Amino acid sequence: MGNRPDELKALLDSVARQDGAPIEVVVVGQGVRLPGLADPAAGVRTVELPENLGIPGGRNVGIEAFRTPGGHGFDADVLLFLDDDGLLERTDTAELCRQAFTEDPELGIVSFRIADPQTGETQRRHVPRLRASDPMRSSRVTTFLGGANAVRTKVFEQVGDLPGQFFYAHEETDLAWRALDAGWLIDYRADMVLLHPATAPSRHAVYHRMVARNRVWLARRNLPALLVPVYVGVWLLLTLLRKPSGPALKAWFGGFKEGWTTSCGPRRPMKWRTVWRLTRLGRPPVI
């Protein structure tokens, strides 16, 4: 979490109101203190980090908190990841999650729908597929929303955690591609809703740099060699077509260069049958 204590309390209250078995909660403070928040009787634990490790780094700390002693396996079958300024709209969301994972043993990740609490609208960028005009349509997808999702812990056991070095942007797609390559499925569920104020992504220089750098890292880490220049080239063209400002474009190209000249972490190119699978799901890994 960051520095939104009122919103966090509302979120925790909405989690506590969920039907079915109680949900154990871990709140990760990224460079902030969490005084008085831990409540063992209510199943709430806290982890205070001395610095901000970024979105994937902080979530990896939360994942680690659910590992069994010795790091072999987990104390839970499914982990929920919720933004600290969100709110679960319904009381049956956790039960819907349990039902989804129980009924489909190949389901690895569920992406919730994010809706504005005032208007009820879902922003197009919060629908994790190319055909995003109807956010009320649930479907099988190729990625997921980082601030509102559920992941089967066996996915982490098999393919590893989120890429902490990404810090911000595209870490979900990195995990999604690895999960899909391992045979897991990802669903977008319009009936599982996290209320979250509609916002625009930050458009500062750091944002543009990380988006560009992580696009390159994503391709270098996960795509067959033949597709790496195609994927990166398509996103270069799309960026230019959007006509960003001069400072934004300068930051973007700085990140683009950084993506090629710095370590992206381990390279594990997906199988060609996974490329075809992504294509059949409506999002070939070139866009």
What residue ranges belong to the model's regions?
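Short, acidic, metal-binding catalytic loop of nucleotide-sugar glycosyltransferases
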Residues: 13-22
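Glycine-rich, basic loop-to-helix element that forms the pyrophosphate-binding segment
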Residues: 49-72
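Short beta-strand-to-loop acidic/aromatic patch adjacent to the donor-nucleotide binding site
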Residues: 71-87
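A recurrent flexible, glycine/aromatic-enriched loop bordering the glycosyltransferase active site
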Residues: 116, 133-151, 173, 203
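A short, conserved alpha-helix in the catalytic core of glycosyltransferases
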Residues: 143-151, 155-160, 165-193
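Active-site donor/metal-binding and catalytic loop motifs
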Residues: 182-206, 215-218
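Non-catalytic, C-terminal membrane-associated alpha-helical segments of glycosyltransferases
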Residues: 210, 225-287
